Every structure is written in C-alpha cells, then in structure tokens.
Design a protein with these regions (language model features):
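Cytosolic Rossmann-like ligand/nucleotide-binding regulatory domains
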Residues: 451-508, 512
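Short, solvent-exposed coil/turn segments
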Residues: 95, 441-443, 483
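Extended boundary segments
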Residues: 423-462
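Alpha-helical transmembrane segments and immediately membrane-proximal extracytoplasmic
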Residues: 1-433, 451-452, 477-479, 493-496, ...
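A structural signal for short secondary-structure junctions
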Residues: 366, 377-378, 440-442, 466-467, ...
Length: 512
C-alpha cells in the first residue's frame, strides 16, 4: 500500500483550501444530481404502490398478489444487504465511522446497492426516510471523487464530509442544515476547512436540487404565527415530554435491532418481515406508510382526535422499530420528525382543550416538537433548530425552537440516553471488529480547533500528554501562522495542524 512522505503532505497542504473548494464544488454537483434522480424515481414509483394498496383495500382478490410482491421485494433487498452489508440502516453511522478512520467501504458498491435498496424500501412504503441514505450516498461520491483525484487521506476525509453535507442538503432542500450536520454530528470539528468545503458542496447540491423541485420548502409552514410569549410556559412541558419520547425512540430502535440480531433467521427473511408488515399497515392505516411527509402535512390540514393521534403514535413507533431494526437500507430522519410532530399535535390538543390555549397554535407545537425530537434523539440541537427552520421556510420560531430543543436535549441527557448514531456506530464497529483491520504506518495531517473547554487551553505543548507518534506542525492564531515549540502556549481559538498515524487518530481526538 502506498505511503505518503511527510514532505509531500506538507507541500500539498499549502494549497489545500483552494483545492478543496474546487473539489467540493464537483462533489456537490454530483451529489445533487444523484439525489435528485433518487427523489424523482421515488416520486414516480411511490404513487403506483399507493394505488395498488388502495385497490387492495377495495378488492381483496389482489391482496395475496400484493403480499407476494412485497415478499419478493424484501428478498431482493436481503440479497443486496448480504452482498454489501455496509448499506444496512441509514448509513450515517457508517459515514461517521469512516471519518474516524476506523471503517472502510467500497464506495462504488455501497453507492449502487444503497441507491437500489433504498429505492425499493422507500417506494414500497416502509417506515424509513431517504435522508440517511442520501447522506451515505453523498459520502460515497465524495470518497469516489477523492480517490479518482488521488488525494491524500486527510483531503479524502474533507470530501467525504462535503459529500455527506451535500446529501442532506439535496434531500431536505436545506443547505445550512447540511453544513451544520457535517460540523456538529458527522465530523465533530468546526475547523475552517470543514466549514468551507461542506458549505460549498451543500450549497451547490441545493442549487441543483432546486432546479428540479423549485424553491418551496420541504414542509410548507411559512404562514404560521409565532407562539405568544405568555404561552411560553408550555414549551417547558413540551420539551420534557418530547425528550422522554426521544429516549423511548432510541431504546426501541436499539432493542429491536438486538432482537433481529439474536434471531437465527437469514438476512433475506429478516428483510421480508418489514415488507410484510408494510402490507398490513397499507391495508389498515395507509397514512402511516413511508417516511411520513404526507402525514405531517395532514396534521396541518386535518383535526385528528386524541384517540386517533395516540393510535398513530403507537403504530408509527412500532412500525419504525421493525423496519429499521431489521437492517433494511433506510434512514430515521423523517420517521423521527413525524413521531415528534404526532406527539406535538397531541400535546397541543391537550393544551387547547384543558388550558385555554388558542387552537390556532396547535401547528406551533407540531413544528417545535419536531426540533425537540431531533435534538433528543440525535443530540445535535443546533442542527435541529436550523433544519426545522429551513424545512418550514420560516425563521419566526427560532426562540421557541431553541427552548424546546435544549430542554428535550437535557431531558434525554438526564435519562442517560446516548446519541442514536453513536450507539449504532458502536454496534457496527463491534460487529466487524474494525480495530483489528487498521492500516499501519499511514500518516494523517489534521486541523483541530481548540474550544473553550478543551484540556489544552492555557497549557504549553510540552505539558500536554499527547498520544505516541503525534507532532504539532503549526498553529493558526487569527491571521498568523506560528511554528510551535515545547514552550508555545495554546489558547482558545487556536487551530492546530497535527501530524499523526492513522491508527491513533481517534485516540488523539479523545485525548484533547
């Protein structure tokens, strides 16, 4: 395997920012086109399935053929999953694993199988979202561009992050959310290089997406009046309940996944199960099919009773648990937002019934609950606030969104619920014993931002306990680049350029 010399890495790093800008633009355009194609095919095939299900509810003769078709599709997805296990689930944990250098994938194989497998699951109506697969496909394209351009490993990491950001941006028509997700959740690093590359890719992918789908936000709630300040006491209760709901979601996903893992059923049978359940749901509660975009819009237009909402919540929870727990390729972004919206609608209805809140503000509780649910489950409150603002096309709810997001986030912390994607990543690493497959001797050149609460702040380089084979090459302080020595003191806001071995990358991040 090729090993890059230190001199070559340092030489290439001089023009890294400009090279990344161009490469990220390429990645963003390619990701945008790929996700647009994915969305268009889904929009064409999904109505066909819905029409077939509708006919099945009125003509029981075709019901057996519906289930035979779903079983066949489940078998095909199972074969795809057996051929390429990395397409399992949303794909976001896999991307995070790649960014920590613990996980490897065949980018082209994952891209192809994820595209096909995700299409089948989404068109058939399984309770999964397209956003996670979009992130993974974007990351695959980022890695593919990097490998074809023969970039160094640290450059590849930036382009993978850019691709993931672009994938979310194109899926939701939410470019800022794509950038923030890359910074807050995927890369967990707010360095200028990550920000620049992710923003260029995200904006370019969003531009491509809007050429096909227009400027209308994903959830059109632009004419909703903000909740009056006198009613803000309700946000505390909403945040706590949504936080608890998020904990239930996390535990349910992990528990169901464990049950499927312990079963001795073949991968094909495991994938067939959620397809059969989908057939049952299609005949009884068709509104619960798919990720849930139509259900959220139905909450805006229709007045459901408490009993109906409670039934929807229980059914959607169980439906999502089974679909995602089975391992079929599909995300949890939209299902978790739908569940948040349902719980928010229920709470809003109770507030209007028993506490005199005007019923015109029920829609506010729906919007706020989606952000709170995301913050509680994913533990990315800033992304949650920006995402819901972009999806609804309104910035009028920022204060209320912030309150609900932080309260739900704290509630899940108190209940000791871990971020869902980190929990899923731990299981993936354990399953594949990734730590035994690391490449030795490969060098990485990293840029690390020094935060206010970092253990390095106020210390000299010589006083910090660095991992073995780790060298601080330079420090960017404002507009000045310093060549450090052992007596150089690190302050908040510094950006450290560190050279290290690939196998201790995660150890380095954990130690600082």
């Amino acid at each position: 395997m090729k090993k890059y010399k230190v001199f070559e890495m340092l030489k290439r790093s001089q023009n890294l920012k400009y090279r990344l800008a161009i490469n990220s633009l390429i990645v963003g355009i390619l990701v945008g086109l790929t996700i647009v194609a994915h969305r268009i095919i889904i929009s064409k095939l999904s109505p066909i399935f819905l029409n077939i299900y509708k006919n099945g509810r009125h003509n029981f003769i075709i019901v057996p053929f519906i289930f035979l078709t779903l079983i066949a599709l489940g078998y095909i997805v199972g074969k795809c999953l057996k051929k390429q296990p990395m397409i399992s689930g949303s794909g976001i944990p896999q991307v995070e694993g790649i960014l920590t250098r613990n996980l490897k994938m065949n980018w082209f194989s994952v891209l192809m199988y994820k595209f096909v497998g995700g299409l089948i699951c989404l068109c058939a109506g399984l309770s999964v979202g397209r956003e996670g697969p979009s992130v993974q496909m974007g990351a695959c394209i980022g890695e593919g561009v990097s490998k074809n351009l023969k970039n160094l490993d640290n450059e590849e990491k930036y382009l993978i992050t850019s691709g993931a950001s672009a994938g979310l941006s194109a899926a939701f028509n939410a470019p800022l959310s794509g950038v923030m997700f890359a910074l807050e959740e995927a890369h967990k690093n707010f360095s200028p290089l990550v920000l620049t590359s992710a923003m260029i890719a995200s904006i370019s992918a969003d531009f491509v997406s809007k050429q096909f789908f227009g400027l209308i936000p994903s959830l059109d709630f632009r004419k909703v009046e903000p909740l009056p300040l006198k009613n803000y006491w309700t946000l505390i209760i909403l945040g706590i309940i949504i936080g608890i709901s998020g904990v239930i979601f996390n535990k349910g996903i992990l528990k169901t996944q464990s049950l499927f893992k312990k079963s001795k059923l073949s991968i094909e049978i495991k994938c067939i199960i959620p397809f059969v359940i989908t057939g049952v749901v299609a005949l009884i509660y068709p509104i619960l099919l798919g990720g849930g975009h139509d259900l959220i819009m139905a909450l805006k237009e229709q007045n459901f009773t408490v009993t109906v909402l409670f039934t929807f919540i229980i059914a959607k929870f169980l439906f999502t648990f089974i679909c995602f727990g089975s391992g079929v390729p599909g995300g949890i972004f939209f299902p978790l937002l739908v569940l948040g919206a349902l719980v928010g609608n229920l709470i809003g209805l109770l507030f209007t019934t028993y506490f005199g809140i005007d019923n015109t503000y029920i829609i506010n509780f729906i919007i706020l609950a989606m952000a709170g649910h995301f913050a509680s489950i994913v533990k990315a409150p800033i992304t949650a606030i920006i995402l819901i603002s972009e999806m609804t096309g309104s910035l009028n709810h920022l204060l209320a969104l912030g309150i609900v997001a932080i309260i739900s986030h704290l509630t899940s912390d108190i209940l000791k619920s871990s971020p869902i994607y980190e929990s899923l990543l731990e299981r993936i690493l354990e399953r594949y014993a990734i730590k035994d497959n690391l490449t030795e001797g490969k060098k990485l050149l990293l840029e690390i931002a020094v935060s206010m609460d970092s253990v390095m702040v106020g210390k000299c380089i010589k006083d910090i306990k660095w991992p073995k084979n780790c060298l601080v090459v330079s420090i960017l302080r404002g507009d000045n680049e310093l060549i450090p020595n052992g007596d150089t003191e690190i302050i908040c806001g510094d950006y450290l350029t560190i050279m290290t071995d690939e196998e201790i990358y995660q150890e380095l991040l954990d130690s600082i």
